[in-house]
Amino acid sequence: MTTGFDLTVEEQLAILMSREVNDWETSACGALSFIPATAMLLGREMRAPNAEIIILGSRDYSPFVTGKDFHFHAQRGQLDLFFISAIEIDQHGNFNLHVIGDRDEPDVLMPGQYGTGMLYYAVPRIVMFRTEHTRRSFVDQVNYVSGAGTSPKGVSRRTREVKVITPMAKLNFNQESRIMELGSVHEGFSVDQVVENTGFNLGIRGEIDTTPQITEEEVHTLRTVVKSHMIDSETYPNEAANLIREP
């Protein structure tokens, strides 16, 4: 996927995730979310000029006084798309942002998810992402369920679409079978490579699509318009300066 453009992983993911931003919808990400913030700004430039963007903690794209206000906004049904960075993801659509290992005596203790588990129920479209595609990230069963991919019968849930985007592939959560499936493979990778680096069955049936190629226009817009805007608007300016290449 990076052939010809010398993309960083952050650039690649931002471009692929930007394609999920729709016009006339409200897309959002939490704090400490450089990649999805970049994706939303690029998506607005490329194909969704009327998209509303919420980037928690930013100067220009965070209309809320507290995170609690943002959560109320979501619970009222006013978000269409939310981006989640998960540490572990399993075949049932569960994600982990808390611990690796035993819950009481963890090998790794992570910051947690600050309401993301609730947003996983409240927002119609969810896009998760990882900067790596390995068996330690895509596991048969997460060590801790920070967000549940399925709900018990009788529990209200607005989420109708869940995708996962990685440097290798895009996965789709099948709402009927309740299993994460392989949706497409990025240029430069094979289905076998994705399978080898995934710790669960990807439900492959028939031929798998190739992800549409990253275009010169997407790369140029990211490295010029979006990078400049992020620096000028103080929206992750240091990350934009260091992780988005020069045109």
Please tell me what each predicted stretch does.
Residues R47-P49, D69-H73, R223-I231:
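Short, charged low-complexity intrinsically disordered segments located at boundaries
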Residues L32, I54, V108, D209-T210, ...:
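Residue-level detector of alpha-helical recognition elements and their boundaries
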Residues A14, A28-A31, A37-A39, A48-A51, ...:
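A sequence-composition feature that detects small, non-aromatic residues
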Residues G57-F64, I84-S85, T116-M118, S233-P247:
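Short, surface-exposed, charge-dense and proline/glycine-enriched linear segments
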Residues M1-G67, Q78:
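N-terminal active-site beta-alpha-beta segment that forms phosphate/nucleotide-binding
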Residues Y61-H220:
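Conserved phosphate- and dinucleotide-binding cores of soluble alpha/beta proteins
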Residues M1-A28, R160-M180, N201-P247:
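Intrinsically disordered, low-complexity segments enriched in small residues
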